Amino acid sequence: MPVSWTLLIVLAMAAAGFAIGRSRVLAAAGGDSRRLHSRTSYYGWNIALFTAVPALFLIAIWLFAQPQANRWVLGAAALVLAAMGLFWTLGRTTPQFRARIAVEGFVRGLLIMCSMIAILTTAGIVFSMLFETGHFFRQYPWQEFFFGTTWSPRFGGGSQLGILPLLWGTLYISFIALAVSIPIGLFAAIYMSEYASPRLRGIAKPLIEVLAGIPTIVYGLFALVTVGPALRDYFAQPLGLGSSGSSVMTAGLVMGIMLIPFVSSLSDDIINAVPQSLRDGALGLGSTKSETVRNVVLPAALPGIVGAILLAASRAIGETMIVVLGAGAAARMDLNPFEAMTTITVKIVSQLTGDTDFAAPETLVAFALGLTLFVITLGLNVVALYVVRKYREQYE
């Protein structure tokens, strides 16, 4: 039996159970819904949930564990489980049954299960990286990885896998991107929320948010074809700082443009959420519009603004395509923003692609790089949480 047929039959049984349960309990109460413990819809939902959810859960687990299993056996098992749930719940559907409590408990259990899936998925990702990183450090000294200044993987042996050049490129490009996106995005949000007319805001905000929907590969091509050559011809070559269109500045500027809608849109929503009474109180005490924004609105909106900046920073650190096309693939430590560099994410991709030995340290280093990115992102979250709590306490 095809899985689609099984799903349709299970859902049909649940729908039938919903209708039968409602009519049956209402008939048992003599047509008087006031004699029921719960509303009639709860009795129907109780039957539908206990009929469909266990069977659907069985199908999902079975297909995940045994994708090639016999579909007729799977369908029969799911239908038997659905029928058991249907008849069991019908048997206890009486006017005195606390259907609302049962349904709410069932839904609460589903929510807990979904939360556990998210938590266990995160834990699984972390433990998988830790496991593979452990294999890597058993083959390559951790001192040379964390403090090495040369990145030169050779699958034939003699590799130098120092992370510092990659970390420097990641932070350098991210810094330039944030230096572009944070001021522009934040000032745009302040203008749209505090100074712009509703008509202008309705036009400007969607136009800015269009940038968020552009694929990163398009930004990368924009960096490769337009921004890179322009920076090379008008800045790098005249100043004697380089002759390549691929550079840290190219990737940072284009990435900053990409991050503007993240900072702007989120900050705008947070600033608009500040109660109008705070603005009215500040204006009533004689503050100007700019003083109200600076001393009242922004401190109140600071937690959300920090969250927007954190989101932009995480996106910048994890970006790959713009760096590949805009900054090149050279792993070096240099202060010149017009030199080609690379980032951790680019090297993760390069080390895991191609016909490589998965047990070799040159491949396993990708997991160590990924774990490093995870730790950096976690550190950003901790710092942001500290800043939010500090300023929120001062404001309160």
Feature map (PLM): residue ranges:
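Membrane-interfacial helix termini and adjacent extracytoplasmic/periplasmic loops
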Residues: 131-164, 219-256, 328
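Cytoplasmic-entry segments and transmembrane alpha-helices of multi-pass inner-membrane transporters
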Residues: 39, 46, 100-113, 184-223, ...
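Interhelical loop and adjacent transmembrane-helix boundary motif
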Residues: 238, 323-374
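C-terminal transmembrane helix and the adjacent membrane-cytosol boundary/short C-terminal tail
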Residues: 269-272, 276, 283, 310, ...
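Non-cytoplasmic
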Residues: 221, 229-233, 304-343, 350
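Periplasmic/extracellular loop-to-transmembrane helix junction in inner-membrane transport proteins
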Residues: 65-77, 90-113, 129-177, 197, ...
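Membrane-cytosol interface at the C-terminal ends of specific transmembrane alpha-helices
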Residues: 178-180, 186-192, 198, 202, ...
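Transmembrane alpha-helices
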Residues: 206, 210-211, 266, 271, ...
